[in-house]
Amino acid sequence: MEARGAGRARLLPALALSALLLGGCATQTAALRAAAPPGVPPRLELAAMPFFAQERYQCGPAALAMALGAAGVLVAPDALVPQVYLPEREGSLQVEMLAAARRNGALGVTIAPRLDALLEELQAGHPVLVLQNLSLPIFPRWHYAVVTGYDLAQGDIVLNSGTTEHMVMAMSTFEHTWARSGYWAMVALPPGQLPVSSDKQTVLDALVAWERNGKPDAVRHSYAAADRRWPGELGLQLGLGNTAYAAGDRAGAADAFRRATLAHPDSAPAFNNLAFVLSELGDYGAARAAAGRALALGGPWRAEAQATLETIERAERGRR
């Protein structure tokens, strides 16, 4: 799905478009106004939000620059244009928005596709970047905006959108426009912070993607936060060990991998990685034992474990 800048869709008669946007049943809005989630205040607006007015068709770079700025990453929309804007589509793909957030030092991750989840993120201090369709489903006009607040009593959502800062929109209208994107939304968070509404697999996938091109120490902080939220999760423990190693902290890496082997005694990758790091730390006996366990577990990691064991033995002989 692509997000196109405003102004490209065929214009509809104003009355027809108004009826389209406001008609129907905004079920999530009605439920929220009837009973807000526990702990969610009736009204909230994030303070000191950066604002960038979009250029023609470039709502993606502007919205992402605002979300990144709120996370402490100061980058101008113009610098994001080559990273996310596709001239032939006159818009930005969601996958590029997530990748660009990570490339610039923030954890870009989707949130749960629900209005209550959006409000929970705002309560946590996370502005939410949303994709809307401001026109007909059959003739979409995709648009990125940043949600910065809400008022349940008034039934309003507050956005930084297009060239308008602090745009107030009826929550029911917002829900209709957002629903047409499948309720797609993301947050861009500084290292060590996690979305409050995203599930474990969504966060893990985002961290793995960030690990590929992010600074190891930054990604490590977010892995550590996720490991605290979901203790004992193998993927998070391995990621924590990998990023600690990449950041130059071999003792920290060994600790993460060791905890992974204790929680998952049948994980060949955990034992193999532990063996590799222990060897570099000079603990050859423990390294050989870990590599032997990885080898004994067999499976697709058998060849890798054999290579690790041979590397350990060569290193040990070289020290004699």
Language model features with spans:
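Cysteine-nucleophile protease catalytic domains, especially the papain-like/related folds used
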Residues: 26-114, 118, 189-193, 205-209, ...
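Alpha-solenoid helical repeat scaffolds
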Residues: 235-239, 269-273, 303-308
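Structural marker of alpha-solenoid helical repeat scaffolds
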Residues: 229, 263-264, 297-298
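Active-site-adjacent substructure of cysteine-protease-like catalytic cores
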Residues: 107, 111-160
